[in-house]
UniProtKB/Swiss-Prot annotation:
Coiled coil: none annotated. GO terms for biological process: defense response to bacterium; innate immune response. This is Sapecin-B. Hemocytes and fat body. It comes from the Eukaryota. Sapecins, which are potent bactericidal proteins, are produced in response to injury. Sapecin B is cytotoxic to Gram-positive bacteria. Belongs to the invertebrate defensin family. Type 1 subfamily. Residues 25-54 form a propeptide. InterPro entries: Defensin_invertebrate/fungal. Induction: By injury to the larval cell wall. One of its GO terms (cellular component) is extracellular region. PROSITE patterns: INVERT_DEFENSINS (PS51378).
Amino acid sequence: MKFLTSLLLLFVVVMVSAVNLSMAKESANQLTERLQELDGAAIQEPAELNRHKRLTCEIDRSLCLLHCRLKGYLRAYCSQQKVCRCVQ
């Protein structure tokens, strides 16, 4: 009788663990999706920084590239509005 009780208890523990693992994987997938959404979201920058970017493009385009390289980006360009844009 003890053997059957132990076996039943072990079965319950394994099933609960499997359910918890499944829920953890689902939560991890949801978190990954949310992080990808946030990664793709546009980030608003302060007006002062935008003003600095415009001045960078109006003075010299190479300063825009230097600015972006220092931030870790590979390429840079100046938009029609003279705003420096950094691109991977």
